[in-house]
């Protein structure tokens, strides 16, 4: 499996990444697919992009036919270019996951970085909205929850689905 996030929409990409182009990322994903690799590609929401940017990212991921889609939620951190961004609301995060599920019907959608600090006790709602996977442990810039806590969340979600 090859992991290579688009990060955001083509329209917003240059505001986030300056070392390479959006088309470079597209070419890399296509090359990985041609090589027969499963591709995990998603992005970060809450960078300052619009809802339309998020929809455009999901549509691009659909067109690329990636296998799984991690949805990271920005946690503004001091000392980073995005430290002054307002944290994305829980409702915006859940709405985005629901839109991704509508667009990416059969794909694995994983809630990832930011889920603990942004969604807090409402992480189960992400699964009700359409997520069907999650990344656990630590992330690039923030610590995740303990595995035992995530296993409890999985059990809670199972109970919700059984009702």
Model-found features: residue ranges?
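Auxiliary Fe-S-binding modules of radical SAM enzymes
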Residues: 34, 59-163
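Conserved non-cysteine loop/helix-boundary elements of the Radical SAM core domain that shape
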Residues: 1-36, 44-65, 80-92
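Conserved hydrophobic beta-strand within the GNAT/NAT acetyltransferase core sheet
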Residues: 4, 41, 109-113
């Amino acid at each position: 499996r090859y992991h290579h996030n688009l990060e955001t929409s083509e329209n917003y990409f240059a505001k986030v990444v300056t070392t390479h182009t959006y088309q470079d990322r597209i070419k890399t994903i296509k090359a990985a697919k041609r090589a027969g690799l499963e591709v995990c590609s998603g992005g970060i929401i809450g960078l300052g992009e619009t809802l339309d940017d998020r929809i455009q990212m999901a549509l691009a991921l659909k067109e690329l036919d990636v296998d799984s889609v991690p949805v990271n939620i920005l946690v503004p951190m001091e000392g980073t270019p995005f430290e002054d961004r307002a944290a994305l609301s829980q409702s915006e995060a859940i709405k985005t996951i629901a839109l991704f599920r509508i667009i990416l019907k059969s794909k694995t959608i994983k809630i990832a970085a930011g889920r603990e600090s942004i969604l807090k006790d409402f992480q189960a709602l992400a699964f009700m909205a359409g997520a069907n996977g999650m990344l656990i442990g630590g992330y690039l810039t923030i610590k995740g929850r303990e595995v035992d806590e995530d296993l409890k969340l999985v059990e809670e979600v199972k109970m919700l689905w059984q009702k």
